[in-house]
């Protein structure tokens, strides 16, 4: 591990090796070469003078990437794609002259971005499904455990611990729906040339538009992404990146809400997230048991939610058929959003699978608020069976509740709300009722 230069915490501390692999240099530049091979094969099939030997040579060198040579070429040429064209050509001297034939940089760059986002979305979906499974098991285990529900983080009415988990799960199911939509609608750029007109390929095929259309279809079939953009400039629309990161932002929102709930429940001592035997909560306060995993979820989620704005601004700032001010931003914003979301979901799964629930504390909190919660049923009963005026009884309950709460909060006394209502003649309740 290098210690003398900056290393991204997303890779060092948070994201899984699987997600890091998707956005690795090996995966990226191998995919470039796969695209160059698909282009050469398709051009050969449509009649261009490309030999089987040239294609075999390209395939044999697909993983033989001399990164030092590519770096040297790029320092001279100031162009990453051409640096790799030359590096690949040096490894395939017989095929060097037909590599990248008719293509522009975005043929490999943009198509690779779509392919990698597709793989990353599949990885994220698998994590979402694992999280939903964990929540489902948790919800079933605690479906019958009553707990105090909160609105405005003030005591409301009873729910169950399992029902509350269904709220978290429902958010993730919504995210899965959004992810599936984007995954099913991801489209390759295809091979449309420098401005999206396919001019270079029309030149190669002597103006045969049918062959140009077939070329794109063949490439898509070989790469395994069935759809291509019907219209583009030099790049695919950057709104596609925004749409994908909207999904990741949505997941981050769901996870952040979950983590906030766990942190609040932890403060109430109703649950604890997993805590290792030798884990330290505070360097100063040895007794502390902080919900640091949930806090980390919230922290990473904030990053992903904010990262969405990068893609929005990038999409809005593109000029005509293309401009390069998207490039540096995309290199950062898209992979890092996936890496952070991957980390968030792995933490989410870890927390819910190891969540410790304390039924005795939950019951204590519920019992303390039961008199207040009973008032809604009392109100309904008295209107229905006693002929009471709903508005007048509601006001009476409000006044009694304020006085009962004052006794609890100011003097530390027991909640006497039910006794106050029972002695109020306007309710007309008997002892047995």
Predicted regions and their residues:
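Alpha-helix capping and helix-loop boundary segments enriched in small/acidic/polar residues
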Residues: 27, 108, 148, 152, ...
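A short, charged helix-loop
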Residues: 214-234
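Generic, well-ordered alpha-helical scaffold segments in large soluble proteins
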Residues: 38-42, 87, 91, 134, ...
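Short amphipathic alpha-helical segments with heptad-repeat character
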Residues: 118-125, 129, 136, 162, ...
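Catalytic-core signal marking the mid-to-C-terminal active-site face
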Residues: 2-25, 74, 280-433
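A helix-coil-helix interface module used to build multimeric assemblies
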Residues: 1-199, 207-220, 281-282, 292-296, ...
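Glycine-rich anion/phosphate-binding loop at the beta-strand->alpha-helix junction
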Residues: 175, 179, 226, 234-327, ...
């Amino acid at each position: 591990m290098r210690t003398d230069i900056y290393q991204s915490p997303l890779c060092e501390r948070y994201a899984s090796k699987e997600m890091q692999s998707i956005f690795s240099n090996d995966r990226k530049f191998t995919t470039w070469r796969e695209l160059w091979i698909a282009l050469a094969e398709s051009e050969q099939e449509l009649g261009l003078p490309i030999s089987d030997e040239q294609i075999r040579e390209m395939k044999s060198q697909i993983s033989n990437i001399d990164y030092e040579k590519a770096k040297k070429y790029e320092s001279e040429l100031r162009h990453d794609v051409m640096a790799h064209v030359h590096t690949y050509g040096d490894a395939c001297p017989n095929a060097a002259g037909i590599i990248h034939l008719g293509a522009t940089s975005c043929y490999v760059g943009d198509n690779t971005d779509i392919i990698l986002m597709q793989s990353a979305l599949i990885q994220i979906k698998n994590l979402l499904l694992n999280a939903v499974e964990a929540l489902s098991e948790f919800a079933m285990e605690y479906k019958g455990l009553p707990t105090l529900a909160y609105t405005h983080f003030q005591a409301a009415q009873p729910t169950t611990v399992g029902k509350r988990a269904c709220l978290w799960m429902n958010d993730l199911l919504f995210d899965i729906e959004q992810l599936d939509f984007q995954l099913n609608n991801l489209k390759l750029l295809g091979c449309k040339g420098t401005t999206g007109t396919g001019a270079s390929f029309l030149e190669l095929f002597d103006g045969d538009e049918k062959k140009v259309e077939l070329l794109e279809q063949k490439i898509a079939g070989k790469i395994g992404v069935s759809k291509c953009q019907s219209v583009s400039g030099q790049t695919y629309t950057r709104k596609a990146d925004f749409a994908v990161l909207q999904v990741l932002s949505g997941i981050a929102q769901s996870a952040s809400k979950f983590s906030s709930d766990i942190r609040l429940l932890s403060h109430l001592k109703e649950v604890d997230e997993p805590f290792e035997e030798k884990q330290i909560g505070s360097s100063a306060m040895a007794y502390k048991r902080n919900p640091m995993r949930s806090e980390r979820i919230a922290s990473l989620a904030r990053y992903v939610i904010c990262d969405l704005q990068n893609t929005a601004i990038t999409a809005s700032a593109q000029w005509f058929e293309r401009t390069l001010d998207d490039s540096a931003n995309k290199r950062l914003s898209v992979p890092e959003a996936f890496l952070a979301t991957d980390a968030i979901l792995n933490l989410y799964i870890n927390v819910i699978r190891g969540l410790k629930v304390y039924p005795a504390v939950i019951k204590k909190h519920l019992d303390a608020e039961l008199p207040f919660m009973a008032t809604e049923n009392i109100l309904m009963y008295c209107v229905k069976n006693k002929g009471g005026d709903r508005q007048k009884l509601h006001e009476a309950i409000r006044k009694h509740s304020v006085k009962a709460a004052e006794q609890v909060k100011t003097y530390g006394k027991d909640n006497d709300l039910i006794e106050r209502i029972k002695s109020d003649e306007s309710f007309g309740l008997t002892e047995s009722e």
